[in-house]
């Protein structure tokens, strides 16, 4: 089984760097397309300040020159979901589960094990980058499918922008998760709740060595419990009373 999680915009490079490997051909093609942009073009491409665009330009050129520092992806990304994932002081069993089952979906690196080396970069599937005339989603679709086609169980903690990179056949196999708060009988869902809960849920999967949908249903984490009345066979809903 594989658990798929998205990348994040926020990154923390205050970490020990690690050795890297050569970029796969699909990644190199994306990098080559990005490297054609000047700092001022990146400003409008990323919709960021000139200062931020200059920083991103340096990151891209460092990757291109193979001088970029690399870090374990799960620790490099530092968005809200990531900050709620157990990333340190894992037992041997938890570490093995993480290495075998948790994969990050990236618009630059593809579908890779969570502790794979990644360099700081900014790219997601909403960005209108063309790679050899194709959209990012079209460019990656075959490789994304290939990464999970043998799996019987695929847990998706992805947003739709990442899920829709996969073919319909693969998406039909995915088990998805929704996290809601019950405020006096009113069910609420918003991105902050979802991001925190996804991190806490992944931590519960790791700590409990979950391998099946049935085991996932039995989890109780960060105040969230499974709600059968709101769920579908492949769409599990967890609710926290506040």
From Swiss-Prot:
InterPro entries, per the entry: YaaA
Recorded GO CC terms: cytosol
Signal sequence residues: none
Pfam families named in the record: H2O2_YaaD (PF03883)
Origin superkingdom: Bacteria
One Gene Ontology term from the biological process aspect of the record: response to hydroperoxide
Family: Belongs to the UPF0246 family.
Record-linked NCBIfam families: PRK02101.1-4
PANTHER family reported for this sequence: PEROXIDE STRESS RESISTANCE PROTEIN YAAA, PEROXIDE STRESS RESPONSE PROTEIN YAAA
Name this polypeptide is given: UPF0246 protein SPN23F15130
Organism: Streptococcus pneumoniae (strain ATCC 700669 / Spain 23F-1)
Upper classification of the organism: Bacteria, Bacillati, Bacillota, Bacilli, Lactobacillales
